[in-house]
Amino acid sequence: MKQWETFAAKYLSATDFKDSSAFYGFNTALLMIRVLKQCGDDLSRDNIMRQALNLKDFVVPGSFPGASINTSPTNYFPHRQLHLARLDGEHWEPLGELLSD
């Protein structure tokens, strides 16, 4: 979260900081950076797809403890874990343990 807070303080208004879409975009950009780093000097479409389908235990800021992104050539869906939560009137409170497929 510290990485997000530093980025948001530098580049976003106070309103944008609270926008979950901005946070999602930030995490998506971090995921793309990870894929491009895995590509090395080979930035061909084939290699970008190969690396995007070879993500292992990548953790984005703000994810629940234990949640990570994993992809494979047979499973394109990066998020295969969820945490049920309940709104207590102001905040989302996690319920139970992290669920995985």
Question: Language-model segments: what does each one mean?
Answer:
Residues 1-101:
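Extracytosolic ligand-binding ectodomains
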